[in-house]
Regions:
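Penicillin-recognizing serine hydrolase domain
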Residues: 17-21, 88, 110-256
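Sec-dependent N-terminal signal peptides
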Residues: 3-12
């Protein structure tokens, strides 16, 4: 056990010391425009939730049916309250709510384990050869992949209207209606700053854990072209923001 702890500490230190992975990809011409450490396998944190959403939507469940929220992990949704599956997906993609992700995984007809198997099968089918998903929220540092894998995931996710439209909602409300007086919960996007700065973002998902650092995956549409921008392992929120701004202003917008 002590050896395992030491190894995990060494791995975490290596992730923290390494430079961030940065990828800019032109999805219109299928061209990699910028690649920095894009083949490094590292934790992806809540970017995981994009795959969770795709896997759940594949089930074809009635999104207006209600389920009770799972409260075994952190989240803003109220304990022992029922929300529609649609509301859970919104809370997960916009607010990055972990309890929503766990609730959706456990809503699989055959349980959470079957859902995780479906997630990993989908990743392999898409060609995410270096990715593995241990949980549906991204809290686990065993959820790993490369920037190139995440690009592959985004190529699939951008074709799903629900994910595309929901992930860029800046702010909305969800009401817990099980009580006599409904309790309204404000759901604000975890990427509100960049969404306000760049109105060309059409898909967005952030991620943050100590092992993963500050992460973000974006799809932008500019000048009739579609671009994917992935940052993994930035040391701070401000550093992540500066990387995104540098790539958009100095790389993407300088293209012919």
């Amino acid at each position: 056990m002590k050896l395992l702890v030491v190894l995990l500490l060494l791995v975490n230190t290596a992730w923290a010391r390494n430079e961030p992975s940065v990828l800019l990809y032109d999805n219109t011409t299928n061209t990699v425009l910028l690649a920095e450490h894009t083949q490094q396998v590292r934790p992806m944190a809540s970017i995981t939730k994009v795959m969770t959403a795709m896997t759940y939507l594949d089930l074809g469940q009635d999104l207006d049916a209600k389920v009770e929220v799972y409260r075994g992990v952190s989240g803003v949704l109220l304990k022992k309250q029922h929300y529609t599956r649609r509301e859970l997906l919104i809370a997960m993609l916009v607010r990055s709510d972990n309890s929503a992700a766990e609730t959706l995984a456990r809503d699989h007809p055959n349980g959470r384990s079957a859902f995780m198997t479906a997630m990993n099968n989908k990743a392999q089918q898409l060609g995410m050869t270096h990715s593995y998903f241990d949980d549906p929220s991204g809290l686990s540092q065993k959820n790993v992949g490369t920037a190139l894998d995440i690009m592959t995931m985004l190529k699939a996710a951008i074709t799903v209207d629900f994910i595309r439209n929901t992930s860029v909602i800046q702010k909305t409300e969800i009401a817990a209606k099980d009580r006599k007086k409904p309790v309204r919960i404000i759901i604000q996007n975890t990427n509100i700053g960049l969404l306000e700065e760049f109105n060309t973002i059409v898909l967005s998902k952030t991620g943050l854990t100590n092992p993963a650092g500050w992460c973000v995956s974006l799809v932008l549409e500019e000048r009739h072209r579609q671009f994917m921008l992935i940052v993994l392992g930035a040391p701070t929120k401000d550093a992540r923001k500066k990387i995104v701004e540098r790539v958009i202003f100095s790389d993407l917008r300088q293209l012919n």
